[in-house]
Amino acid sequence: MQLVRLDYDGNRSITASLSPAQPFGEAFVCAGVDAAPISVIAATESTILWLEGEKLLHPCCNACGFHQQLLFNVIQLLARKNVLFHQKLEITAKRTTREKLLAYLFQQAKQENSNTFVIPYDRQGLADYLEVDRSGLSAEISKLRKEGILESKKNWFCLHL
């Protein structure tokens, strides 16, 4: 599943890719936002478990350990997602397609602890995540290949640095 934002021109930006059973929307619930400015797109048939925000954020009158653990988990989840948001911001704040692409690929290599890795996007998805034009992204990948900086095939990359 992907969290996607559409601008007024219909341009798509992938905010995040989600794994099965990964929660989403908790920041909007905690902030009291009624209508989230994102859409969730499922690539395959999915079932969504809807939890009411009020029940999540306000523990029962017994102040049981379950609710304390639940609140702790929500805070931890928000903190982790904040870190991921800042990692994406670090990428999208770059000025050029090349800078954005290399910043993203370096992050992936570091995360995988390897210069060889598979990303969760096809070319259009990667362009949407980086907030760049797909044809410009493909041209930049081609240049980086010719310069010997990387090898790639579909969503597989190998960095040579």
Each language-model region and where it sits:
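Cyclic-nucleotide recognition modules
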Residues: 14-72
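Phosphate-/nucleic-acid-contacting segments
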Residues: 97, 104-161
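A generic structural motif
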Residues: 4-8, 41-43
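Residues that act as N-cap/strand-start positions at coil-to-secondary-structure junctions
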Residues: 9, 34-35, 144
